[in-house]
Amino acid sequence: MNKFEDFAIKLREILDIEDIKIDEPMKEHTSFKVGGPVDILLTPKHFNQVVDVVKLCKKENIPYYIMGNGSNLLVKDGGIRGVMIKLVKLNKIQVKGNKIITESGVSLKDISTTALENCLTGFEFACGIPGSVGGAVTMNAGAYNGEISNVIESAKVICNSGEIIVLNREEMELGYRMSSILKNGYTILEVTFNLEKGNKENIMNRIEDLSRRRNEKQPLEYASAGSTFKRPQGHFAAKLIEDSGLKGESVGDAQVSEKHSGFIINKGNATAKDILTLISIVQDRVRQNFDIDLYTEVRIIGED
């Protein structure tokens, strides 16, 4: 029995977590559909289980990682040594007046739907973002001139000591695809959004318009992690990539989408190595042509 199998037994016995998998292929848990096995993947149902797992990992010196639904995650082919804590079962959501209070595993689509049902406006921009709340807040996700920082009020997080604290919007230091939560390695448990009362028909029309635009412009028929690169200041990554002659460029089954050059897609059987090689080709070509560095928006973890 290796140390991770022994640790999995401790998790089951001490923390009463039933959903624990050993050597679980991460390609089954990411939207890119690639990635080697993680030593332990567990899916807690409650805040206190997440807190207890984090504390136990720290005590036993076991590396741990946090994920939602894996829509912005690229796991390398060698997999992950340690524990992956998947938060998708933290999925409670409630409405109090103009506020939506949601656990970190709730999808942005479900929040958009809840807002619509309660005639709350401000969250329409996120209707097509495939991620869950925790990752979206951590990265200050955005689309169509909206972003999380415009609608968030507070977040309940686990800080590095294992203590649960509440951060207000200013303390989160939300910028373009960044936050103090990301910088400090905090884990989000719950988020409160503050929206405005609106007209249900107008909200629905806005959601339908954004969904139509997204379907027309993005390669949703293929596995991907959404926009692969962050937007360089004063430029658009997709235009730089296309102007570098890279639309349709492929490595194995990884391809710069012919529909939207800002997306690298998996056409079926790509490996993480294929995707990472293609990312490097894109970065090198754009740097050579425009003297601009492209940085990945997708989170890359694991071993080669």
From Swiss-Prot:
One of its GO terms (biological process) is cell division. SUPFAM superfamilies: FAD-binding/transporter-associated domain-like, Uridine diphospho-N-Acetylenolpyruvylglucosamine reductase, MurB, C-terminal domain. The active site is at 177, 227 (proton donor), 297. GO terms for cellular component: cytosol. It catalyses: UDP-N-acetyl-alpha-D-muramate + NADP(+) = UDP-N-acetyl-3-O-(1-carboxyvinyl)-alpha-D-glucosamine + NADPH + H(+). It comes from the Bacteria. Residues 33-198 form the FAD-binding PCMH-type domain. It is an enzyme of class 1 (oxidoreductase). It is found in: Cytoplasm. It holds the Pfam family FAD_binding_4. Pathway: Cell wall biogenesis; peptidoglycan biosynthesis. PANTHER family: UDP-N-ACETYLENOLPYRUVOYLGLUCOSAMINE REDUCTASE. NCBIfam families: murB (TIGR00179), PRK13905.1 (NF010480). Belongs to the MurB family. Cell wall formation. This is UDP-N-acetylenolpyruvoylglucosamine reductase. It comes from Clostridium kluyveri (strain ATCC 8527 / DSM 555 / NBRC 12016 / NCIMB 10680 / K1).
